[in-house]
Amino acid sequence: MMMKNLILASGSPRRKELLSLYTTDFTICVSDFDESGVTAPTPAQLVEKLARGKCLAVAKDHPGAVVLGCDTVVDVGGEVIGKPHSVEDAKRMLRALSGATHEVHTGVCVSDGVRTESFVDSCKVTFFPISEGEIDAYTATKEPYDKAGAYAIQGRAALWLDRLEGDYYTIMGLPVSRTARLLNRF
């Protein structure tokens, strides 16, 4: 695969690992995009706007490069759950996910400075009930604090997974197959 300079506009170690399944020939430039004022009617539309904003913020400073921007949110009944800000926030999130089905939306945007394309991939996730003891033990680790919804599906949260409908890698923050197909068009 020959591609112009590919830049991942994310500091996520999981996205770096997943993009490496496609190519190891990329650099990382974390976007300085300000997410605070971004709104949208639905969580899926929000995550696409966030991915696009991150992508374009990096693309403007790297003409000629192909930039990949991503964002992931957890959606519980239409309410966006981002990354927890505290132990209590993480516990609140995990209680909301316990024994319930939620959606994970990952927005992906690619731009070469001339053309910009994006998509959202969604996955339904159902957890078994999570005991207070499990929540306490999990929130005592570092695992939940840099992840949307306060969990890492590839980590200890795998123990709570009842079922999922969709792409497992969407939950991790980069739907690899669809992203590869999009990158192949650039």
Model-derived regions, located:
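N-terminal beta1-alpha1 ligand-phosphate binding loop
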Residues: M3-T24
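Short loop/helix-cap segments at secondary-structure boundaries that form the rim of catalytic
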Residues: E17-L21, V38, K60-D61
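Anionic-ligand binding patches
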Residues: M3-I7, P41-F186
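Short linear Ser/Thr-Pro motifs
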Residues: S10-S12, S31, S98
